């Protein structure tokens, strides 16, 4: 996987397009959503094995701004994967806590536009990745995944991603020695209100 990641990073620097940005974020969301031991922290470590401290830069400067480029049918599964990254990766909650608010804000803006999961797949999904030989790696990961991976994020996140985010934040308190509150205080009120409603419904308190 490291050679694939390196090729992706070269493409991001040399000839980034909106199409490639969308597929790159989709790829990261897919990896973070894999229901396997050690994920999504393994995704962070994969990037950091290429260059120390790299994933924090990718999260803040690539994933966060490019989430908005996702088409409607790609939003649900990708958002669910990024929520896992925000709440189940020790590095995101500690080493890369500075990048956490920007990524959280982006995923919450995405949730405001995201309805129930759309299961239709069109033939051009992944075309830009395929041009670089990345689609083969994507397909390899998908075929090696569990049945839970294959049926999509709804099977493990449920149909309501706000509720899923709230529950995951409750669990994230065990990974972060400091309070989550300072991170959430950096989120604008218009999106934080929606999250607070979900926290109340799920009986989760962030102190």
Locate predicted features.
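Alpha-solenoid helical-repeat scaffold
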Residues: 1-207
